[in-house]
């Protein structure tokens, strides 16, 4: 935790370590958003309509043609960055479990109300997740028209395809030039190596792998209105947009890849708090009114801290003593296991309570 510009608390458990480069999963979406904000500032002439720029065109996404649904013509960059494109991505079922996956559903949100959407399963999950990384995102099914509902999915990867075409380089290289080098990050990368092969492109929907202190540096950059030392690395106008509700998403408290607490749905946290969760319980939080940045590490499975996923060298000896730990089951006095997102919000409330007690 960083408070008033100082590292005031740091504690690691199990495989977590200061030098670890875990797959932070959807925390990576925050960085995709930041990169898009920088892109729009540096290439303003390419985005005369700003976030309202329609991007399913030959200029930005020629790979998307022919469009799988004519409604895609109306998708704006702001829709991609708030998960309101209307695209429903395929579910990648494990071999032999396709029937189970098909029977499940995803939960969309329309003006605060849940909408259950039946899963659809990719017929070739290995190909879609690896070789056709871009195409499988671009050719999802439309469950509603752009802007008409929120659904957590692969929209930010599509935004990263737009970025790749506009700036002429991969998302990881762009982040390295615009943030990592100026801020002095240590070893970092993306979890691009999968069981089915290596991804051809930086995954815009997640997978960034930073040291814990560099994750905090990024949060501190946001808390300091996009400034690092004497440089404005992130456009202030974009930072102001991502930290409050977005007109592109009237359905849920999710702005430009950040959960925002303006509505007070995290009751124990200030309403100016904004943050992002990652699978398994990762969380990176900014609370401007308390001048506080928090990073919560976690683990989804054995692959989370596996250096084979990132290709980065292991520079420490992992502590495996907690590998078999499991939470206490539910009873009258114990809540039992909770989901990653619930845990992320609860952790925010507990840290805030400790800071203001």
Where are these regions (language model features)?
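Active-site rim elements
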Residues: 67-68, 145-149, 202-207, 271-280, ...
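Short, charged, amphipathic alpha-helices and their helix-cap/turn boundaries
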Residues: 6-11, 56, 93-145, 169-189
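A short, well-structured edge-of-sheet supersecondary motif
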Residues: 1-16, 284-285, 291-295
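Non-transmembrane alpha-helical segments in soluble domains
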Residues: 37-40, 56, 78-82, 118, ...
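Active-site helix/loop module of the DD-peptidase/beta-lactamase fold
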Residues: 23, 27, 41-88, 92, ...
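Structured C-terminal helix/loop/strand segments within mature extracytoplasmic catalytic/sensor domains
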Residues: 276-357
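Active-site-proximal alpha-helical segments within enzyme catalytic domains
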Residues: 155-162, 206-228, 282-299
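Active-site Gly/Thr loop motif
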Residues: 185-188, 192-193, 241-295
